């Protein structure tokens, strides 16, 4: 069993006791309630325990000592009813204030307490004892209190008394304990105007309306919770399908990449020489072009630009036919090759382009050199044909650089 007293009741009793000239006594008003305490252990096994709590809400002081009993401890019920009146059903105990005494119940107090328990019909009647102690020089004053619950076996059983707003306590004690208002004036005002604010059950009308709104909100919240739960389940299913589709797409990409790689490897194994053939032909053409004279061409243009390149520069120095090659011929001479052959000049330009650029210089020089060129070319050609009739084309093919045609491509001479 435990006991609790409100802060203003405790302060009122202490104030009345400290300002009195002698000892005094009175009655404690309140109620007894059952409080259930749940204890949950680490093994998730809960156990409930019921605790009886005595709550003191108010007090009723007596005018003087021995107001409802005599010196022998006999109680006068008429005087007791005159003091308590209609609050007799709210009595849960009585109290006594003594000065400079020990915190023990006297024999008279024990007799009075036993009679009050029988008259009021309260088996759990309690007794609150206040003692005021001060030093000789009045420098220190101490107010002590103790709560007793006398019974048949032991009269000095002490009960812990707690004050909700005294000490380092939590605010939950205010929610658990409710202190009713026992004022007569408050009761008369509520009785007169209570019909406007309270219904027949004593509950405020606004409170009932608030509870109705609260219930409606709770129903709506429960409905929304069901919808949210269903939508979350649908979302989880859709998310699973999306994840499966992503995995399938990634698998298809990997398979397609592997298939393309296999096709490329198979193509490379089937045609291994196809890629190397153009490179070899290109390198051969490049080799022919680069096999020409290494000397840089002269930037000065010769007087007779229509003459073909000198064969002595194209043939190797040790060629036996180098001394028998004809010297450059003029355009139109019988021994000069046709411009359509597109012989190169050694610097990458064709003879046709040079002929067209130097046309103005050729016209006034052709007449002077025609007779002389014809005689010399016929004689030299005759001598070369008698000495080496078949070695001239081979020599030209070996020593002549690749011919550049007007389209810019390099061509090897015929017979190469």
Swiss-Prot record:
<feature type="compositionally biased region" description="Acidic residues">
    <location>
        <begin position="363"/>
        <end position="378"/>
    </location>
</feature>
<dbReference type="GO" id="GO:0008017">
    <property type="term" value="F:microtubule binding"/>
</dbReference>
<comment type="subunit">
    <text>Component of the BRISC complex, at least composed of abraxas2, brcc3, babam1 and babam2. Interacts with brcc3; the interaction is direct and may form a heterotetramer.</text>
</comment>
<dbReference type="InterPro" id="IPR037518">
    <property type="entry name" value="MPN"/>
</dbReference>
<dbReference type="GO" id="GO:0008608">
    <property type="term" value="P:attachment of spindle microtubules to kinetochore"/>
</dbReference>
<keyword id="KW-0206">Cytoskeleton</keyword>
<feature type="compositionally biased region" description="Low complexity">
    <location>
        <begin position="273"/>
        <end position="286"/>
    </location>
</feature>
<protein>
    <recommendedName>
        <fullName>BRISC complex subunit abraxas 2</fullName>
    </recommendedName>
</protein>
<keyword id="KW-0597">Phosphoprotein</keyword>
<feature type="region of interest" description="Important for interaction with brcc3 and other subunits of the BRISC complex">
    <location>
        <begin position="221"/>
        <end position="242"/>
    </location>
</feature>
<keyword id="KW-0132">Cell division</keyword>
<comment type="similarity">
    <text>Belongs to the FAM175 family. Abro1 subfamily.</text>
</comment>
<feature type="compositionally biased region" description="Basic and acidic residues">
    <location>
        <begin position="254"/>
        <end position="272"/>
    </location>
</feature>
<dbReference type="GO" id="GO:0051301">
    <property type="term" value="P:cell division"/>
</dbReference>
<keyword id="KW-0131">Cell cycle</keyword>
<feature type="compositionally biased region" description="Low complexity">
    <location>
        <begin position="338"/>
        <end position="355"/>
    </location>
</feature>
<feature type="region of interest" description="Disordered">
    <location>
        <begin position="254"/>
        <end position="416"/>
    </location>
</feature>
<feature type="coiled-coil region">
    <location>
        <begin position="228"/>
        <end position="262"/>
    </location>
</feature>
<dbReference type="InterPro" id="IPR023238">
    <property type="entry name" value="FAM175"/>
</dbReference>
<dbReference type="GO" id="GO:0031593">
    <property type="term" value="F:polyubiquitin modification-dependent protein binding"/>
</dbReference>
<keyword id="KW-0493">Microtubule</keyword>
<feature type="domain" description="MPN">
    <location>
        <begin position="3"/>
        <end position="149"/>
    </location>
</feature>
<comment type="function">
    <text>Component of the BRISC complex, a multiprotein complex that specifically cleaves 'Lys-63'-linked polyubiquitin, leaving the last ubiquitin chain attached to its substrates. May act as a central scaffold protein that assembles the various components of the BRISC complex and retains them in the cytoplasm.</text>
</comment>
<dbReference type="InterPro" id="IPR023240">
    <property type="entry name" value="BRISC_Abraxas2"/>
</dbReference>
<feature type="modified residue" description="Phosphoserine">
    <location>
        <position position="377"/>
    </location>
</feature>
<keyword id="KW-0963">Cytoplasm</keyword>
<dbReference type="GO" id="GO:0005874">
    <property type="term" value="C:microtubule"/>
</dbReference>
<dbReference type="GO" id="GO:0005634">
    <property type="term" value="C:nucleus"/>
</dbReference>
<keyword id="KW-0175">Coiled coil</keyword>
<keyword id="KW-0833">Ubl conjugation pathway</keyword>
<dbReference type="Pfam" id="PF21125">
    <property type="entry name" value="MPN_2A_DUB_like"/>
</dbReference>
<keyword id="KW-0498">Mitosis</keyword>
<dbReference type="GO" id="GO:0090307">
    <property type="term" value="P:mitotic spindle assembly"/>
</dbReference>
<dbReference type="GO" id="GO:0005737">
    <property type="term" value="C:cytoplasm"/>
</dbReference>
<keyword id="KW-0539">Nucleus</keyword>
<dbReference type="GO" id="GO:0000922">
    <property type="term" value="C:spindle pole"/>
</dbReference>
């Amino acid at each position: 069993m435990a006991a609790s007293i409100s802060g203003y009741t405790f302060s009122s009793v202490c104030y009345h006791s400290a300002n009195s000239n002698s000892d005094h006594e009175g009655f404690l008003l309140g109620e007894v309630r059952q409080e259930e305490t749940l204890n949950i252990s680490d093994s998730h096994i809960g156990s409930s325990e019921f605790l009886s709590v005595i709550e003191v809400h108010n007090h009723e002081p007596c005018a003087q000592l021995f107001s409802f009993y005599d010196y022998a401890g006999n109680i006068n019920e008429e005087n007791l009813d005159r003091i308590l009146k209609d609050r007799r059903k709210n009595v849960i105990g009585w109290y006594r204030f003594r000065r400079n005494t020990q915190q023990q119940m006297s024999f008279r107090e024990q007799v009075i307490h036993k009679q009050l328990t029988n008259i009021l019909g309260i088996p759990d009647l309690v007794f609150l004892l206040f003692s005021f102690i001060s030093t000789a020089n009045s420098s220190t004053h101490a107010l002590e209190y103790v709560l007793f619950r006398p019974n048949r076996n032991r009269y000095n059983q002490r009960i812990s008394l707690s004050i909700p707003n005294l000490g380092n306590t939590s605010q939950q004690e205010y929610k658990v304990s409710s202190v009713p208002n026992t004022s007569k004036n408050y009761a008369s005002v509520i009785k007169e105007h209570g019909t406007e604010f309270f219904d027949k059950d004593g509950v405020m009308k606004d409170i009932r309306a608030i509870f109705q709104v609260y219930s409606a909100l709770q129903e709506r919240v429960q409905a929304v919770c069901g919808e949210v739960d269903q939508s979350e389940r649908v979302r989880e299913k859709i998310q699973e399908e999306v994840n499966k589709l992503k995995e399938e797409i990634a698998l298809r990409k990997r398979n397609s990449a592997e298939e393309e790689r296999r096709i490329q490897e198979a193509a490379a194994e089937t045609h291994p020489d196809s890629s190397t053939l153009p490179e070899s032909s290109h390198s051969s053409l490049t080799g022919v072009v680069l096999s020409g004279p290494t000397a840089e061409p002269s930037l000065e243009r010769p007087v007779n630009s229509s003459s073909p390149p000198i064969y002595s520069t194209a043939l190797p120095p040790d060629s036996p036919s180098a001394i028998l090659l004809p010297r450059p011929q003029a355009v139109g001479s019988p021994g000069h090759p046709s411009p359509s052959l597109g012989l190169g000049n050694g610097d990458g330009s064709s003879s046709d382009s040079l002929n067209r650029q130097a046309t103005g210089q050729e016209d006034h020089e052709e007449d002077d050199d025609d007779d002389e060129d014809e005689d010399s070319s016929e004689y030299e050609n005759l001598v070369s044909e008698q000495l080496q009739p078949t070695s001239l084309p081979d020599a030209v093919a070996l020593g002549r650089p690749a011919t550049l045609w007007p389209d810019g491509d390099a061509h090897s001479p015929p017979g190469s």
